[in-house]
């Protein structure tokens, strides 16, 4: 990009801070980028950073396996250095096309009249409008009031351009506010220029209008992130946030051979007076990824109660297995206690997340007639979840109360249970890279959990030792995770909406049990099918900036096979012990295993 004056060349192209990448899955299939030199992937043959370094859009694309090149070369990055929102820019080189964001959207819509609703569209613009107006005011061509009016108009025009994307079919639009340009090397070298005030004016006008757009806005708080980098560069792996890394006036002409120090591109924040170094662009890309991936992580909270109910069922089921072929008197209470350990190892769909459950269940039941049994059980589960890729995790403590009843007549039997749980999620943490550093955002929330099931089966007695027969179960669950905000006030602290996860699971299979003296082995294999495993989305936003968006979250496999084998044995004149092992197979999202151990005795 060229400048109106040599000293303004570097100012004309927006300022920002950048970050470092990582890996994770995201539920969208394409990106499109619109903006100025902060996002320009090489319209002029080089980029406004330490070349051949990348800009944040390219770093983000690499994270998701996308090659980001300029649209002028057939790519998905429409940004052009020097661009303004709608007006022609004197900061664009003579003879080069005048491609404001308005023109960039024209080009995008010409190539794709109906926009891909599963893509993310990134818009970062406005800094050059500030640079041009400040320069005009310095030349006596505009008054301060006119400059303020022009910047307000630029922000309003940005909202109008975002609305054009919405009207053409875009569903998720990533909107960046401006960093504090007054804190850049250029801004600090011209302290009388109103860069900070105009950055704030543009941002406040832009942010005030986001809610009226009625489209998913993925907010990117560059103002906050920029100030955090300036305040604590070491936290991001940087050593210099005040002077440029390049010896050339413009980063467009900067390479690793023209640095003030050999590694300045990785330790300085600024390549020139306003443009980020590759290290800073990496920070921006990491920040963007952390925001858009956050709903997927938090969506796993809604899955955790489903696992708790499975642990409760294994505990009560183990108690029922222990009662086979062991007659008991009517109107006598049996008490039991069970420990269950479960491990859920998810696939890469969740970045390799993992859950470890430790459950204790205690209950009593009574044979109230020759055919009927009734009981109640109290359970407590600690579920420790990991988001995978060292991306944080959570802890769920759930207390449950379950009532159950069973009826048998000859070889037939049926039963039902109903219960509820109180969800206490704490130490919910998202950990993510920000350049060479990392950050963790924390939060807590609560929720409710209800569940009910009916089941039945039939026993064939083929010998005096073994019985076997069909088994069927239908289980309904509903978990509600309350909305919450993370506790920090940083640029990356987020809010998350209420989640509702429903499941209607059928289990159909065959089971068998034998008697060999005081030992009674048992086993069951079932086909599990969830009829209510619909797509879910989690609503999210920033604590520090308006705008909310929904991202589809992890969906469990709704077809798999479940195995359960174990045995019960007489441990004394009254005490009966039991143990079982459960495991899944053919579960595309990752299998789980569990061990259940318990004792039962009459009171």
Model segments located where?
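Gram-negative bacterial Sec-dependent N-terminal signal peptides
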Residues: 1-26, 405
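Conserved active-site regions of diverse hydrolases
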Residues: 3, 25-328, 341-347
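A detector of low-complexity, intrinsically disordered, Ser/Thr/Gly/Pro/Ala-rich segments
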Residues: 5-9, 19-21, 67, 253, ...
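Ser/Thr-centric signal marking residues that sit
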Residues: 11, 277, 445
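Short, Φ-rich (hydrophobic/aromatic) sequence segments
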Residues: 13, 17, 307-319, 527, ...
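Short loop/turn positions at the edges of beta-strands in beta-sheet-rich folds
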Residues: 20-23, 311, 368, 571
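Membrane translocator/pore-forming domains, dominated by Gram-negative outer-membrane beta-barrels
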Residues: 332-603
